[in-house]
Amino acid sequence: MGLKADNWIKKMALEHNMIEPFCEANIGKGIVSYGLSSYGYDIRVGREFKIFTNVNSTVVDPKNFVEENVVDFVGDVCIVPANSFALARTVEYFKMPNDVLAICLGKSTYARCGIIVNVTPFEPGFEGHITIEISNTTPLPAKIYANEGIAQVLFLQGDEPCDVTYADKKGKYQAQTGITLPRILK
C-alpha cells in the first residue's frame, strides 16, 4: 500500500472527479491553508455547523441520537464553546476509487490551539461530503473559520482492489451531502 503524491492526486481529481471542487495550489496566506500539498490534500470546512448543547439535558446516545442535542449554525466563523464539540462538513465532495483508502488528520494550526479534528477513513468506493468532528478541548471558546483548511487527507492505494467497496455494501453514509448525524442501520 503506497502513499500517493501530488501529481497522482491532481490527476485523479481532474480526470476522475475524485475531489470537487479541487484547488491545485496550496492556498495559505492570511488563512488556514487548503488545497494540494506534496503528499495530501488540505480540505476546507463548509459554512454549516451543528454545535452540541446541553440545554435539553439529554444523554448523547449514538444508537438513538436526539437532534435536540445540537444547534444549527451557518456562518463564516463558528464559535465552538469551551470543552464542547461541533460537527461540520467539507466544502469538497469526494468520489473514492475502489483501490484507495484515505486517512484524514487535523491541521497543526488548529491542534496547537486545542482544537482536535476527527474524521473516519474514506473507504474505497465511498462518495459524498465528509462529516467532520471538531472538539474544543480548551476552557475557552474557539473559532473555526469556514471555507478555510481544517484537516489534511492522505491517500493510500492498495496493492489490489478490495472485493467489497463501501458502495457495494451500501454504506449508511454513502452519497451524503451536508452534515450527517449518527446513523444505526436497523
UniProtKB/Swiss-Prot annotation:
Keywords: Hydrolase, Nucleotide metabolism, Nucleotide-binding. GO terms for molecular function: dCTP deaminase activity; nucleotide binding. It catalyses: dCTP + H2O + H(+) = dUTP + NH4(+). It holds the Pfam family DCD. Its EC number is 3.5.4.13. DCTP binds at residues 107-112, 152, 166, 176. Pathway: Pyrimidine metabolism; dUMP biosynthesis; dUMP from dCTP (dUTP route): step 1/2. Coiled coil: none annotated. The active site is at residue 133. GO terms for biological process: dUMP biosynthetic process; dUTP biosynthetic process; nucleobase-containing small molecule interconversion. Homotrimer. NCBIfam families: dCTP_deam (TIGR02274). This is dCTP deaminase. The lineage of its organism: Bacteria, Pseudomonadati, Campylobacterota, Epsilonproteobacteria, Campylobacterales.
